[in-house]
């Protein structure tokens, strides 16, 4: 089914990204919490959405769901320790730099050095985030690594496998940050699928 046309009074040329279900190929807009303008994302066939905050695509040759994914969730709290995260979700402040610093300081995970990037007219940072080699995920709270959350008492974004890895892009939107990421469930994912996911990630325009 084709995506709905924008409302006649809406100046945006694209429809909103569906909150759940299969996504038709096309360009969509996504609201940013605390910012007046949405961003745009272009998605090919075969992707699906979940809860308005994530996009995913399966690898037919891999047993796991969500082989590759894009996350668009707002971040209010970062776990100081991703393994023992219950009671350790800390408010990292509203800036892009604060998020980068909190992720780099997080125990049980590791980050690459952040690289400065420009997305449209906005500046930001990009870095990779992944599980530390010596972490026993079965011993972690809930059997998972909590990366960040929208709330203090529950986890919004977590890793469930040791091979999970993400590339984050955090953009400063005139004092309000936007956080987006592209990831894979483990290293066995088809490289072509990962390249497709990266192209979706790179299509994001603020």
Predicted regions located by residue number:
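Generic signature of intrinsically disordered, low-complexity, basic-rich segments
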Residues: 21, 26, 92, 98, ...
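N-terminal targeting sequences that direct proteins away from the cytosol to non-cytosolic compartments
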Residues: 1-76, 82-83, 152-163, 169-176, ...
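Signature of long, low-cysteine stretches enriched in small and polar/charged residues
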Residues: 97-169
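Extracytoplasmic/secreted proteins, especially bacterial periplasmic and envelope-associated proteins
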Residues: 94, 98, 102, 192, ...
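Post-signal peptide N-terminal regions of Sec-secreted extracellular proteins
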Residues: 63-96, 107-110, 134, 139, ...
